[in-house]
UniProtKB/Swiss-Prot annotation:
The keyword Glycosyltransferase does not apply. Its EC number is 6.1.1.21. One of its GO terms (molecular function) is histidine-tRNA ligase activity. InterPro entries: aa-tRNA-synth_II, aa-tRNA-synth_II/BPL/LPL, Anticodon-bd, Anticodon-bd_dom_sf, His-tRNA-ligase, HisRS-like_core, HisRS/HisZ, HisRS_anticodon. This is Histidine--tRNA ligase. Signal peptide: none annotated. It comes from the Bacteria. Homodimer. It is found in: Cytoplasm. It comes from Burkholderia lata (strain ATCC 17760 / DSM 23089 / LMG 22485 / NCIMB 9086 / R18194 / 383).
């Protein structure tokens, strides 16, 4: 009796957690290089924290009645020691934890930045994923509105550096704790009048986090939210002066903004300044960067009272904007593709490829897909398809004569098939290639 060959099930990735494929990696690298250059220009230092933290960090830091903590965190119990752990849903709390644990603020304020994956258990949709990537800054130890203005200015400069347009700034002030408490009383009184028409989400938040009701996306509740008591009307002199100082600095730097009284953010640690950069090009997920001031957080997590502000931006959303506006850079090919025919030629080609890499050139050495020798024709097709600027050709005849063939490909500009193959001494190969690439680049600039 013969057994039927059992079909092996094809495995796929987790829904909402996406692979970054080679054809997209160039765009990621372009964005990362651009943002890192900007962060250096502002004196920010990189910090890297673990993906997994103690769950308590987020329940204390973000707030127990926030959507993130209540229903979006990937949390689990460590089978080894029973610790409650969570895959980070955001990184501000982790950066603050690290700054306290390692006493980073002992010698004064710090400007820190991070980049990496975050995790939230929510319904995947355009611009919203279960694993997503953020870059963010945390300015720890700065209390004035100038720090708020500077981190906002950084975002504007990044949009300019990337060539992005149509991203608009909205700002608000959440004031101080006592001002929010006074506003909360009046807000609950106001919302209670509409208890019979509030949706389930708003009813759930009414007594736990009523400020978030103002941020509702339900069309039926927009008028109620619009007419609700505004927190900005409850600000005291200190909060008002801080907010006005921020506005003056933004205007002085020609940064247009809109004051949005309903902008409250979804994390409990914010006070005073909050802001969002929004676009209408991404549908419902229009926020591409957001942040503000979180002065209470460092003390709340066990540190000394320290002012702080920062922002985070969703990398996937920004990359989508770059594609939407046709700003994605062309993927660059390598400099050289080395082809060969014959055993001796293969050995010499292998050595030459390494020597070319020693000089800083990017080189692909042709390796057979099936282990059998490939024809020059098939190798040259691969070379042209690779995007390389030049093919370096090793045959038995060339090796015997101490020469190689060099042919410009499409990656060097023009029609690769019509370019003439040249014979070059092996000893002069590197110099020839460098001169040829310089000439090709100059022709491309004309």
């Amino acid at each position: 009796m013969t057994e039927q060959k059992r079909k092996i099930e094809k495995l796929t990735g987790v829904k909402g957690m996406n692979d970054i494929l080679p054809q997209d990696a160039g765009l990621w690298e372009f964005f990362e290089a651009t943002v890192k250059s900007l962060l250096r220009a502002y004196g920010y230092q990189n910090i890297r924290t673990p993906i997994v933290e103690h769950t308590q960090l987020f329940t204390r830091g973000i707030g127990e009645v926030t959507d993130i903590v209540e229903k979006e965190m990937y949390s689990f119990t460590d089978a080894l020691n029973g610790e409650n752990l969570t895959m980070r849903p955001e990184n501000t709390a982790a950066v603050v934890r690290a700054s306290i644990e390692h006493n980073m603020l002992y010698d004064g304020p710090k400007r820190l930045w991070y980049i990496g994956p975050m995790f939230r258990h929510e319904r995947p949709q355009r611009g919203r994923y279960r694993q997503f990537h953020q870059v963010g800054v945390e300015a720890l130890g700065f209390a004035g509105p100038d720090a708020d203005a500077e981190i906002i200015m950084m975002c504007q400069r990044l949009w300019d550096d990337l060539g992005l347009t149509g991203i608009k700034l909205e700002i608000n002030s959440l004031g101080l704790a006592e001002e929010r408490a006074a506003h909360r009383v009046e807000l609950i009184k106001y919302l209670e009048q509409f208890a019979d028409v509030l949706d389930e989400d708003a009813k759930r938040r009414l007594y736990t986090n009523p400020l978030r009701v103002l941020d509702t996306k339900n069309p039926a509740l927009q008028e109620i939210a619009q007419n609700a008591p505004k927190l900005i009307d409850f600000l005291g002199d200190e909060s008002r002066a801080h907010f006005e100082g921020l506005q003056r600095l933004l205007l002085a730097n020609n940064i247009p903004f809109k004051i949005n009284p309903r902008l409250v953010r979804g994390l409990d640690y914010y006070n005073l300044t909050v802001f969002e950069w929004v676009t209408d090009k991404l549908g419902a997920q229009g926020t591409v960067a957001a942040g503000g001031r979180y002065d209470p957080l460092i003390e709340q997590l066990g540190g000394k009272p320290t002012a702080a502000c920062g922002w985070a931006m969703g990398i996937e959303r920004i990359l989508e904007l770059l594609k939407e506006d046709d700003l994605a850079p062309e993927q660059e090919g390598v400099d050289v593709y080395v082809v060969h025919q014959g055993e001796t030629a293969r050995e010499q080609a292998f050595i030459a490829a390494e020597r070319l890499r020693d000089t800083g050139l990017d080189v692909i050495f042709h390796c057979s897909a099936d282990g059998a020798p490939a024809s020059f024709k098939s190798q040259m097709k691969r070379a042209d398809a690779s995007g390389a600027a030049f093919a370096v050709i090793f045959g038995e005849e060339e090796v015997a004569n101490g020469t190689v063939g060099v042919k410009a490909l499409r990656g060097a500009g023009g029609d690769g098939e019509k370019n003439v193959q040249q014979t070059v001494p092996v000893e002069g190969l590197t110099e020839f290639l460098i001169n040829a690439m310089v000439a090709s680049a100059e022709d491309g600039d004309d």
